[in-house]
């Protein structure tokens, strides 16, 4: 059976149209629909300035040359430059962070629900990695990084960085969202508000319920 070229072109055009007809990714945790716009915000949480009123300061930020304070429980600090610091990033789908690590400090297991991350190590030695999804048997992809090395953390994957050196470490990372979001696994599981029922977590993690209660007390907001 011969198929006309015009039919093929029509079919391909329809497929291309369908491929482009997807919902944009949300830039906050949720967006509850309302009928009264007076009590609402735009889906990305930002209104746009009149382009004629834009100025250079809307696309500028400073301070990433300064080390973050790492005197905390995980001994690291993340300095974020996203749409909240640079309004001109709105709708551009990109942001940046500086991460400082004390010796043996870590950026604990976490995920960015809205962004892929690409990290470059500037100073020190890091052990980094991410874990793939259940469908991929939760494989660990990990490397030791030295200055100048680059590693990518795919969107949504749980990942971490640990300073395995005796000196401070510094890294910079780009994120494919103006507001990538961050979910720190231990904090949300054991420090949610209100707390998750400890019996649920005890069964999920195969722990004694008293151990879970102790963890929830430590991570309580």
Curated annotation (Swiss-Prot):
Pfam families: Cupin_1. Keywords: Apoplast, Disulfide bond, Glycoprotein, Manganese, Metal-binding, Secreted, Signal. Mn(2+) binds at residues 110, 112, 117, 159. It is found in: Secreted, Extracellular space, Apoplast. Glycans are attached at residue 77. Residues 1-21 form the signal peptide. It comes from the Eukaryota. The keyword Cell division does not apply. One of its GO terms (molecular function) is manganese ion binding. Disulfide bonds join 31-48. Residues 76-213 form the Cupin type-1 domain. One of its GO terms (cellular component) is apoplast. InterPro entries: Cupin_1 (IPR006045), Germin (IPR001929), Germin_Mn-BS (IPR019780), RmlC-like_jellyroll (IPR014710), RmlC_Cupin_sf (IPR011051). Oligomer (believed to be a pentamer but probably hexamer). May play a role in plant defense. Probably has no oxalate oxidase activity even if the active site is conserved. PANTHER family: GERMIN-LIKE PROTEIN SUBFAMILY 3 MEMBER 3 (PTHR31238). Belongs to the germin family. This is Germin-like protein subfamily 1 member 19. It comes from Arabidopsis thaliana.
